[in-house]
């Protein structure tokens, strides 16, 4: 039989004995929710000020509470605070210490408040602040890509589909593709900040409170646009956490694709880019190795972010309104994802700025795999008036001939091309170089250097306002 213990002093009036040791272990969240100490104190300071302003507590009690909370914040920041698992969570740890510091006045702080709305406001504040940090990190990554895109607006390289050579593009154009991706990520972050900007403080356990509180006052004090409108939803909601994990997972997908390309491109077989020693490691047995570990670790860490999203979706999917203890498991998922996303974005921004681009290798590869075949087909349509499907067929025969002769399309003789279609003229050879190919792609959003530079100008203006 388990040893009987005294019940928790914060909620134990109903209980004759304390929790079993294993219950104490599974119930405690202080091991991870101590990360919310600053937000918890911030919320309590706002709540106490409101209670005093509305006459719910005396001014002297408010002053003691305020001073005590500031003392606790300093103790935590200086590493002098002792966290107790017996007190379950960050809220009770702080309240218990407040009682030690100021006595009975500490018991007035929780008037018109429940841990349900307390943790909801703490967590919202933390996620909101993390979203702002993510936005700043994404801006930095986008700026890194803009720098490289401007530098390589005319650097030709192969574009791929199915990882097979498709058409020539420029490295600048490829960089701008990632600007678009991370730009959408930044937009999602901004949208999430707009939706999270409501304060649940004052919703109490689930039904609101009979005390004459001022929720607009606390919302304003905490930097929220307004209070939430339904007390039941306020304490039941974790959409903001799921939305953070969702946008983090999408961003992680972009980071992982980029990491994969860096890994591939840095192989001797591609040799498109080279990472410096700052973002590489060696082998314990093979002295010649220089491994792109930073990119590989970004690729792996993004998988953890996906896992966090699935975990919280699964936790929340079957919960009745309002609060259930299951929701205690939300924080570790978000904390882990936020830490890994921040690290991955920062590492990738460093790698993008660090990359040495092998222009010669890119240009050589750009002309391989008959990458200008589409240019031949387009010339047949524009110049000879062939329907595109017929031009496609003629070009396919030309590729087959070049392949049998083991030469590029531009190395076929005019006579050989005319054996496929007699109307072909020598003019066509001017359209079969990779430089001509990329310059011709002047459609809006295309890979022509002048169009890439237009994209860069657009994003520089947009990111300056983001």
Curated annotation (Swiss-Prot):
Keyword Amino-acid biosynthesis tagged: yes
GO molecular function: argininosuccinate lyase activity
GO BP terms in the entry: arginine biosynthetic process via ornithine; L-arginine biosynthetic process
Pathway: Amino-acid biosynthesis; L-arginine biosynthesis; L-arginine from L-ornithine and carbamoyl phosphate: step 3/3
Catalysis: reaction(s): 2-(N(omega)-L-arginino)succinate = fumarate + L-arginine
PANTHER family found in the cross-reference section: ARGININOSUCCINATE LYASE
Protein name: Argininosuccinate lyase
Native organism taxonomy: Bacteria, Pseudomonadati, Pseudomonadota, Alphaproteobacteria, Hyphomicrobiales
